[in-house]
Each structure stands twice: as structure tokens, then as C-alpha cells.
Amino acid sequence: MQVLRVVLKECGLIKTRVGKLSLTAKGKQLLVDHNELMRTIILFLFRDYNTGWLDSYEDNEVGNLGRLYSLWLLHHYGADWRNTGFYADEYSKAFPMLNAVHGYEYRVFNRLFRFIGLCEINESDDFKGKNWGKEVRKTELLDLMFTFE
């Protein structure tokens, strides 16, 4: 809930007045235009949202830089369950100046893609064991929301 509050506030959709949250004029306007509401939130999440906001990893750029490349990777390779380390390796090839070992997998998949429904993470009882929580696959929503040429 805290992340949602931050996203809505940073998008200018809510404000705090006398300790209470309320909709801004922009927020009220977007309540009737769901497409524009979704566009506003998605643009914020992919351009401005700092996925390192609530963690202790030192490199702030990991997972934030090249976010659309990470989305393309999931789109391209995500039909089947894959270890998140695979995506971190591919990301490291594209951005060798970053230390993607720390934070990338958690920030990208847990803090962004799963947050907006673009991936599933294997946290069900069927996946208990060594790779529990470390394998992901894309959802149908990813292909419905984004196209790549």
C-alpha cells in the first residue's frame, strides 16, 4: 500500500491535507478516463519510479537503468519459467558498468513487473525447494500492454 500511495502522489493524483488523503483535480479527472489513468501510472513506473526506494542495495542504478530492456527480455524469453539469474546475466551484458548481481532480480521482478501484473514468480507450493521465488515467466498482460518490433 505504501508503494501505491507514493506512485499516486508522485503522479499528482492524490494529496495529503490535514493528515488525510484526497484526490487532486487531476486524480478526479482521470477517474473517468481509465486509459489515461493507466498511461500516467505506467509512464511514471517506467520512467521515474525508483525501484531501490525501500532496499539497502548500494547501486541505485541497478534495475532502474534500462528498465525497458528488462521488459523486452521478459517479453522475449518469458513464455517459460526461467531463473531470474538468466535475466540478470543478460542485463549485465547490456550494462556491464553496473553490478547487476545485487538487487537487479528483486527490484525488477518483485518491485516492478509483478507489482503491475507483468510476471508471475514461482512462490506457490508446487515450486517449494531450491529455486522457490527465483523463477519467473511473463503473464498474458505483458503482451496485451506492450508490443515490440
Predicted ranges, named:
Residues 1-10, 17, 98-117:
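Short amphipathic alpha-helical interaction segments
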Residues 2, 29, 65-70, 99:
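Short, mixed-charge, low-aromatic patches
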Residues 10-14, 57-60:
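Short N-terminal helix-initiation segments at or just after the protein's N-terminus
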Residues 13-16, 85-86:
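Helix-boundary capping/turn motifs
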Residues 15-52, 120-149:
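Accessory beta->alpha helical hairpin/"wing" motif in late/C-terminal subdomains of nucleic-acid enzymes
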Residues 24, 28, 53-57, 92, ...:
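A near-ubiquitous, low-amplitude feature marking generic local secondary-structure context
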Residues 34-88:
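Leucine-rich, amphipathic alpha-helical/linker segments
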Residues 72-111, 120, 125-130:
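Extended alpha-helical scaffolds
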